C-alpha cells in the first residue's frame, strides 16, 4: 500500500524525557500528547502505548526507548521516552544520543535522586545542549518553599555538570492532574484548567529554550545503524538517526564497520511510516538498501558517503571515570583492563593499553572519579573519528564516558 508523503513545514527537533525512575517521565510524555492533541497537534498516546511491550510493562518500568511525534506552534518534535532504570542505562545512551534537548523530570515531592544525577551526566557526555526542567507532582507539595528548594538543588546539579544557567528553565506542574482533567473533559481548551495550562507552559518553554539545532546538513552523510530488518520482496532496511549530511534515493553509500567496507545503493527512505525523497541530519529514518542481505549488515555499522569514514581499532581519548555514587566502579582499574566500549549504537570489547596524566606522565592505575587520557585498542575495527563520544561499560553498567581525541590506527 502506498505510504502517505511526509510534509516538512516546521523545523524538526529531537527531544526526550530524562530523570529518575517513577518521577513521571512516561506520564509526562502521555500528558504532552494529550494536551497538544487538544489543538490537533498530536495523536494521544496513553501510558501503556508509550511503555511498550507487555513484558516491559509487567515490571512497571520502561525498558526500550519509545518514539512519539507531536507539533507545537513553532516546531515538529520527535520525542523519545528514555528509560529511567539504572539497569537500562545502555538504552538511555542510545536514546539520549538522539536528543537536541531534554525535558528533565524531577518529582517536586522527592527532589533529585541518583538517576537524576546520572541522566544529567549522561546528557552532558552525549552532547545534549539544552535542558528544560519539569517539576512534576506539584499537587503533592503544599509548601512553596519546598518547591523552591527542589529547584535550587536541581539548578546546582545542572551547574555542577557545566550546563549553563541560561540553558535550562524550570516549569512546575502535574502530568497526572493534566491527563485526568483532559479525560474528564475532552473539549477542554488552553485557559480552562491550571494543570493543563502548565503542560502548555512547559511546551512554550521547550519551544523557546530548546533552539532548533543547526543541522549538519552541509557535511558528508553519516548514519549509525540501530536496527536491521528484511522486507520480503523489497530488500534490507537499516534504521537509525542521520547524524549528518543529506541522503537521497538513488545515492551510493558505503557500509562501514566490523568486516570489509561494502558499497550499495539506496532504493527507499521512510520516516514515521511515510516515504521521503531525501533524509536530512537529525531525521530518524529507515533506509532500504539494494543487494544487501540481512547477514551483510548489523547494528553498530554506519552508512556513509563513500570515502568519508574508515574503521579503526586504536585511539586516544579523554575519559571521565564515574564515581561509586554515580553508579560507577567501587575499585580502581589498571592498564590491560578490557571493558566494553559503547560506540554510537554498539558495544565493542577493547583493551586499555595506556593511561596518561595531564602532565604527560604514564599512570598505571585509575580511580573512580578520575579524568584521564586513555589509549585503547578495540578487538575489531569500527567507524570512529575525532570528537566522537562513547561510553565505557562493564557488566551492564556505565563506568566511564569519553571523547576520542586522536586516531592512532
Swiss-Prot record:
Domain of life where this protein originates: Eukaryota
Instruction: Show the segment(s) annotated as G3.
Output: 81-84
Under the heading PANTHER family, the entry gives: ELONGATION FACTOR TU, MITOCHONDRIAL (PTHR43721:SF22), ELONGATION FACTOR TU-RELATED (PTHR43721)
The cellular component terms of Gene Ontology attached to this UniProt record, alphabetical and capped at eight, are: chloroplast; cytosol
Q: What are this entry's molecular-function GO terms?
A: GTP binding; GTPase activity; translation elongation factor activity
Which annotated residues bind Mg(2+)? 26
Record EC number: 3.6.5.3
Keyword annotations: Chloroplast, Elongation factor, GTP-binding, Hydrolase, Magnesium, Metal-binding, Nucleotide-binding, Plastid, Protein biosynthesis
From the UniProt entry, list the residue stretches annotated as the region G1. 19-26
Where is this protein localized, as stated in its record? Plastid, Chloroplast
| Keyword Plastid (UniProt) | yes
State the name under which the record lists this protein. Answer: Elongation factor Tu, chloroplastic
tr-type G domain residues are 10-214
Query: What's its job?
Result: GTP hydrolase that promotes the GTP-dependent binding of aminoacyl-tRNA to the A-site of ribosomes during protein biosynthesis.
Record region (G2): 60-64
Asked whether the UniProt record includes Plastid among its keywords, one would answer yes
Species lineage, top-down? Eukaryota, Sar, Stramenopiles, Ochrophyta, Bacillariophyta
Amino acid at each position: 500500500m502506498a505510504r502517505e508523503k511526509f510534509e516538512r513545514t516546521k523545523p524538526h527537533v529531537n527531544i526526550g524525557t530524562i530523570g529518575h525512575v517513577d518521577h513521571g517521565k512516561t506520564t509526562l510524555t502521555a500528558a504532552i500528547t494529550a494536551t497538544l492533541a487538544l489543538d490537533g497537534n498530536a495523536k494521544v498516546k496513553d501510558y501503556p502505548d508509550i511503555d511498550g511491550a507487555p513484558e516491559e510493562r509487567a515490571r512497571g518500568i520502561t525498558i526500550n526507548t519509545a518514539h512519539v511525534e507531536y507539533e507545537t506552534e513553532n516546531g515538529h518534535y520527535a520525542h523519545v521516552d528514555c528509560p529511567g532504570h539504572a539497569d537500562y542505562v545502555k538504552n538511555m545512551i542510545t536514546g539520549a544520543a538522539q536528543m537536541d534537548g531534554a525535558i528533565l523530570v524531577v518529582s517536586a515531592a522527592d527532589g533529585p535522586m541518583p538517576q537524576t544525577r546520572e541522566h544529567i551526566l549522561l546528557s552532558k557526555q552525549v552532547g545534549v545542549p539544552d535542558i528544560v526542567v519539569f517539576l512534576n507532582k506539584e499537587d503533592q507539595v503544599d509548601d512553596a518553599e519546598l518547591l523552591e528548594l527542589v529547584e535550587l538543588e536541581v539548578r546546582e546539579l545542572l551547574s555542577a555538570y557545566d550546563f549553563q544557567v541560561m540553558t535550562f528553565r524550570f516549569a512546575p506542574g502535574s502530568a497526572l492532574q493534566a491527563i485526568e482533567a483532559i479525560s474528564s473533559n475532552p473539549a477542554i481548551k488552553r485557559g480552562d484548567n491550571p494543570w493543563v495550562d502548565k503542560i502548555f507552559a512547559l511546551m512554550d518553554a521547550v519551544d523557546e529554550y530548546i533552539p532548533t539545532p543547526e543541522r549538519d546538513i552541509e557535511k558528508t552523510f553519516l548514519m549509525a545503524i540501530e536496527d536491521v530488518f528484511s522486507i520480503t520482496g523489497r530488500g534490507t532496511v537499516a534504521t537509525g538517526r542521520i547524524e549528518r549530511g543529506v541522503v537521497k534515493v538513488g545515492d551510493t553509500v558505503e557500509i562501514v564497520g566490523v568486516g570489509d567496507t561494502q558499497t550499495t545503493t539506496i532504493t527507499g527512505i521512510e520516516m514515521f511510516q511515510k516515504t521521503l525523497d531525501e533524509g536530512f541530519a537529525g531525521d530518524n529514518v529507515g533506509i532500504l538498501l539494494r543487494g544487501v542481505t540481512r547477514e551483510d549488515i548489523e547494528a553498530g555499522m554506519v552508512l556513509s558517503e563513500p570515502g568519508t569514514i574508515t574503521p579503526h581499532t586504536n585511539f586516544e581519548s579523554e575519559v571521565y571515570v564515574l564515581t561509586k555514587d554515580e553508579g560507577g566502579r567501587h575499585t580502581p582499574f589498571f592498564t590491560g583492563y578490557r571493558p566494553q566500549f559503547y560506540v554510537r549504537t554498539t558495544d565493542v570489547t577493547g583493551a586499555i593499553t595506556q593511561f596518561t596524566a595531564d602532565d604527560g606522565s604514564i599512570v598505571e592505575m585509575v580511580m573512580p572519579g578520575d579524568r584521564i587520557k586513555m589509549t585503547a585498542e578495540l578487538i575489531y575495527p569500527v567507524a570512529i573519528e575525532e570528537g566522537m563520544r562513547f561510553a565505557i561499560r562493564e557488566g551492564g553498567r556505565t563506568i566511564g564516558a569519553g571523547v576520542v581525541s586522536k586516531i592512532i590506527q
